Regions:
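Glycine/tyrosine- and acidic-biased, solvent-exposed loop/turn segments at the edges of beta-strands
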Residues: 1-71
């Protein structure tokens, strides 16, 4: 499930993705339908598992978190 901004039918701007259980999966920025800019990924149970930056859908700056502790 996606909640956020669209431009010309593509995800663009700030948005959030959710798992089927309703928990947040990703929150961050999109450009031309792809993750682009700052974002956070969460596991199925709501724990942060990645925080960093994306470029054209790829991770380019990574801060990985295990058990909610940034490493």
């Amino acid at each position: 499930i996606f909640e956020g901004e669209y431009l010309n039918g593509k995800r663009n701007g700030k948005g959030k993705e959710y798992y089927d259980n309703g928990n947040l999966k990703f929150e961050g920025e999109y450009k031309n339908g792809k993750r682009n800019g700052k974002g956070k990924e969460y596991d199925y149970f709501g724990n942060i598992r990645f925080e960093g930056e994306y470029l054209n859908g790829d991770r380019v700056l990574v801060h990985i978190s295990f058990n909610n502790k940034i490493k």
